[in-house]
């Protein structure tokens, strides 16, 4: 691996870990790195003069996007939600997608330790879907070139139909679904596959939020009447709160629209804390009354 420049100002500006309580449960937003994707693709039909005010593009029209994972101290054990990109990919891939996840250990590992745990403490890894920027850190490349699960003592949780869909490998999806991110988990027999909405363990509920992919899921953390929702790519940044602000990457944008509509209805009624996986600045917030933005909640 060639020498890489130091972290960008965007990455340097992200605290490695931010923590807070949801009722009696404690959650940690762990910054697993940064990527840069085309701003037009990230905002779909929204005109550039509108989205560029919120997240300015670089000279290649890419915008910085966090790779924000969630660590949950649940009664049933430590749960990690999503894993970032990891560090398996080559220089060409990292250049195209502007990936920053320097060195060994990975930032995800560093973040887990900064939250007071060891990677081996993770008992479940929930994957909202299997795109490379969510499932890439689920596996790693060993010194001899083999690819293995990064959390061999954990069960990996995904919607069963998402895993089936990821193996279809058609031209539209093959750049996002990279088999080396999930096939080693199958080889190690570490999957815990779910179907639809399920209570994973006390305080953690998985809910379908399709549109970005047909079997995308979001994660609810529920305790003492309080709820946090890890949205993942149904709403990747706080700038995507408005219903029609939908990514060009979404396979079924009108389904995304309805997923967001249903989530926002509950988020307003129940005053959810919304957790944004890719927002380069805002880790979480509460939906405003018009469902057009969020107000910041905590650090």
Segment roles from a protein language model:
Residues 135-146, 286-288:
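Metal-dependent catalytic neighborhoods of phosphoester/phosphodiester hydrolases
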Residues 3-6, 100-117, 121-133, 143, ...:
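Metallo-beta-lactamase
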Residues 9, 17, 59-63, 207-212:
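Short Gly/Pro-enriched turn/cap motifs at secondary-structure boundaries
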Residues 17-114, 218-233:
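Conserved beta-strand hairpin/beta-sheet module of binuclear metal-dependent hydrolase folds
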Residues 79-81, 126, 156, 228-230, ...:
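Residue-level marker for buried hydrophobic side chains located in beta-strands
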Residues 32-33, 83-86, 130, 161-162, ...:
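Active-site metal-binding loops of divalent metal-dependent hydrolases
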Residues 98-110, 224-299:
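Cap/insert and terminal regions of metallo-dependent hydrolase folds
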